[in-house]
Structures are given as C-alpha cells and as structure tokens.
C-alpha cells in the first residue's frame, strides 16, 4: 500500500541549504564560511556539519571583527569553533585602522560597521578565497531580497545588482576568473521564524543575549542601544535599565535591542510570529543612513 512521503518546510529548506553547501565544496578550491557567533551563522555551521559529517567541515570559518562586538557573542564564537575543531580566521578592523587601510570615524554617530568592507576584502585576497558563505536572508532587507543565492563579485569585490546571473531551479553558475569570487547565501530563502524554528528543532545553543535579560540602555532614533565605551551618548539620551533581548547581533554601536520578556526559544518564536517589523528594520541603525544604505554598502563589497 503506497504511503505519502511529506517533507516539512524546515526539511525542504535544510535540504536546499545542504545541497548548496555541497555544490560549493565541489566546485570551488578555497571556500570559507562567515561565522560571527550570531543565530544565522550558528544555523549555517549546523547545516555545514550535517552536509559533511562524519568528515570534518572542509573549509575554515572567518569573522570580520570590528572590536566593538558583544562579549557574549565573541566568547560563544571562540568556544563553538573550538568544539567543532574548525579553523577560525579573525580579520580585525583594528588591524586595518593601524595599517592605515581605513580611517576610524569620530563623533556621536561613529561606527566601525562600514569599515568592515575593506577588512573583509583584504582577508579574501590574503587567503585567496574564491567563495564565501554568508548568512544573509531575503526577508531581512530589500537589497538582500533581490540578491542571488550565488552572488557574483568582480575583481574589486563589488556587487552589481544589474549584473546577476540567472538561477534556474537548483542550477548555479560557479564560473569565475582569477581575482573574482562568489558570495553564497544558503539560507537566503529562510525567514527569521524559520531560523528560530530550526534552532528549536535542532536544540542549537545560541548566545544568551538573544533571550530576555536586564541591560542598561538609552534610546537613539527609536532604537535601544546598550551603554558601552564605544558610543558617545548625548546629554539628551538618559540611561535606564530595562528588560530586552537582541533579534540580531552586530557592532555594539549600531545594533539595537528590543523590549522583550521572551526567555525561551518557544517564547521567542511566539514573539517573532507576531511581529510586523523586520529585525534589521527594527534594530539596525546602520541601515538608516539612507533609503539604499545596505545596497550602497553591498556595491562596495559588504557582506
């Protein structure tokens, strides 16, 4: 008697992501996976485990470290990489500043976020990477929504939205010339809710700041920023302590928290399911510089 074989949404997304990772491992000589210790890159690393175990993950992981990251996330990054036995490459924005490759911003709105582009491109060149896995998703932001899964970057590391390759079904064009590379986004079709559902299903450990906790914050442009030594707080920005969590993590100078009491994965899932604002739209000050802030950065070589 025939039986129906049904795959859940997560099973379909997982299979697609694993296929993409195996395709890259087979077609490129020197791939790497961007791993910041955030929830999306944690899911990416879990998918890489599934794609290649019982063998070792056949590429290193890399983090572009601004030096202004949350301690909880950096500690998790180092511990997780050590547990898996993967090679962790840390590309430092501070090293780029010291070498005169970039100039640090000053003033109230200063951030190292944009400076990461130069550090990233230098690391790609130094390590001769020809493919780089990223954890970007189409539901995050409109520039990422129109980017291909296999995103071509020219010899300068730049992205041209008008020069994207057709992607038919699960067929990907991996051909590049010397000096060019491909940014690959295996979880491009996932949503924030899918990520959390997968974290729950796979029982993945994530940094504690993704759950509700008390933190001293101040409000700037509608965003709750953590009090820290890297941000110049104005006299009109009083500090207060409240219960928050982070939907996304990045540079402390431009990543905001959200008011929340969600202290478990199930509670976070319920909260995400009810929200009508994207995580970057609600919490990322770096995306508010202009209407096309993300696309402008990506054109220059950003993640």
Q: Where are each of the predicted segments found?
A:
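Nucleotide-activated chemistry modules centered on ATP-dependent adenylation/adenylyltransferase
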Residues: 1-303
């Amino acid at each position: 008697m025939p039986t129906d074989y049904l795959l859940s949404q997560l099973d379909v997304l997982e299979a697609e992501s694993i296929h993409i990772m195996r395709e890259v491992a087979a077609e490129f000589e020197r791939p790497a996976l961007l791993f910041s210790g955030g929830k999306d890159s944690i899911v990416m690393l879990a998918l890489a485990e599934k794609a290649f175990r019982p063998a070792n993950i056949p590429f290193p992981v890399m983090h572009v470290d601004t030096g202004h990251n949350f301690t909880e996330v950096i500690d998790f990054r180092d511990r997780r990489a050590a547990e898996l036995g993967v090679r962790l490459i840390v590309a430092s924005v501070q090293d780029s500043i010291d070498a005169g490759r970039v100039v640090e911003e000053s003033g109230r709105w200063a951030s190292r976020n944009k400076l990461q582009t130069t550090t990233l491109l230098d690391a790609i060149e130094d390590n001769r990477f020809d493919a780089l896995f990223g954890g970007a998703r189409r539901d995050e932001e409109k520039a990422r929504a129109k980017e291909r899964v296999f995103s071509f970057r020219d010899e300068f590391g730049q992205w041209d939205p008008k020069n994207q390759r057709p992607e038919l079904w699960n067929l990907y064009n991996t051909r590049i010339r010397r000096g060019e590379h491909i940014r690959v986004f295996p979880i491009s079709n996932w949503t924030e809710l899918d990520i959390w559902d997968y974290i729950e299903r796979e029982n993945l450990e994530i940094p504690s700041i993704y759950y509700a906790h008390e933190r001293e914050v101040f409000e700037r442009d509608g965003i709750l920023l953590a009090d820290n030594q890297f941000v110049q707080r104005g006299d009109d920005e009083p500090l207060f302590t409240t219960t928050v969590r982070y939907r996304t993590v990045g540079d402390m100078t431009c990543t905001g928290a959200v008011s929340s009491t969600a202290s478990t994965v199930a509670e976070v899932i319920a909260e995400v399911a009810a929200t009508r604002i994207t995580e970057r739209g609600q919490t990322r000050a770096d995306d508010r510089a202009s209407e096309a802030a993300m696309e402008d950065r990506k054109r220059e070589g950003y993640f």
